[in-house]
Amino acid sequence: DVRLVEEYREVPMDTDLGPQLIGATPVWTGTNPGAPGPYRGESVVYGVIDSGINFGSPSFAAVDPVDGYVHVNPLGAGTYLGTCLPAGVDAGRCNAKLIGGYDFVCGAPGNQCVAANREEPGFGDTNGHGTHTASTAAGNRRNVVFSNAPLQISGVAPRANIIAYDAC
């Protein structure tokens, strides 16, 4: 007996409620009591220890796709960390927002870093979880369409910089 049939569909891992759920809007607008002014994470470096990051996501672009905010690399323009160093496997993938990354999976002694295990050298995300958590915390604002409805999504601190640590 078949009791339920549902259409298969894939839903992108985008969040639109994080900032609202924690009350970030008054901090962003500077209307929070005692706030010296609007604040969206400028001068914060967020480290995410997870499954890596999707380098191609607009959530981690050097320029915010919604308001055009140009991120400032606190290390200095063109200076990056970890596998984004000039001789690293991720050289050329970092930018003023995504300022570095480290690979603790493929770089671990005895680890089987092969395609069959869905791992590759560097801190690229092979399953999406690290990308989702990093964008929830510090992803740029983005205009997206979800279930045919336009939405604007954002990390809690969209103007923060990010260093990704691929640990799983």
What do these predicted ranges mean?
Residues 1-45, 56-66:
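Autoinhibitory propeptides
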Residues 2-4, 41-46, 93-97, 158-163:
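Loop/turn elements at helix/coil->beta-strand transitions in domains of secreted/extracellular proteins
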Residues 4-5, 50-52, 133, 162:
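Residue-level detector of buried hydrophobic side-chain packing
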Residues 10-12, 51-55, 60, 105, ...:
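Acidic glycine-/aspartate-rich tracts in secreted/extracellular proteins
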Residues 31-38, 87-89, 124, 152:
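A generic local secondary-structure boundary/capping motif
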Residues 38-39, 43, 54, 123-131:
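Soluble non-cytosolic domains of exported or imported proteins
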Residues 61-92, 97:
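Active-site-surrounding "flap" and adjacent substrate/cofactor-binding loops of secreted or lumenal enzymes
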Residues 100-168:
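Subtilisin-like peptidase catalytic core
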